[in-house]
Amino acid sequence: NLNREYSEQDRQYRTLCIKNSVADDLFEIKGAGISDCRYKQLYHNTNYWPEGTKTPSKLYQQTSTGADYRHKDLMPLIRLPEMYYIAAECRISGPDKDLGEARSLLQEVRKARAVYEELDADLDEAGLMAQLEKEYRKEFICEGVVFYFYKRLGYEKLPRQSDVMSGSKVIDDAVYMLPYPDFEIQSGRIQ
C-alpha cells in the first residue's frame, strides 16, 4: 500500500529533520552561504514543527527498479571534497604549516559549491580550523564523516549538542570507540 509506505517513511524523516533556523545558521544563508548549492540540494522543506523544518534529501531513496535503483544504499568511501579538507587540515596543523595554502584548498571547495565570498585572509590557525569544521558539517550531512573528524581531533563536547542529549558528560573513548561485532567476540578474533 503506497500510502502506508509513505507514512512509514514520513515517520522516519520526522526524527531526522532539523529546524529551519539551525540549517540556515549552519549554511550562513544570511551571508556568504546564500548561494550554497548544498543547502538547496541536500535539504527539502518539511513542516513537522510550527517554525518549519528541513529534512536531508539524501536520506530519501526511491524503491523503484528504475535506472537510479542501482545507486540505492550506496555510499562513497571518500569524495574529492574530503581529500581537499584532509589536505587543508594538514596545512593548518601539520608539520608543513601553510595557512595560505589551507585557505586556498577550502576556498576551492567553497567555489565549487557556489560560495564565492573569499575567506578572510587574516584567519589564524584556530579560525581556519573552525571554518574547516563548518565545511565538514555542510558537506557530509548524515554520512558519519564528521564523527571521525571530531574523533581525530579529540573533541570533548560535540558542537550544537545540548546538555540534555549528552547528559553534560565529556565525550571520550567510550563514545568514540565503536563496539566489537558480536561475531568477533564469539569467535575470539579480538586481539
Residue spans of the language-model regions?
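Acidic/polar-rich alpha-helix caps and helix-coil junctions
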Residues: 1-18, 22, 28-191
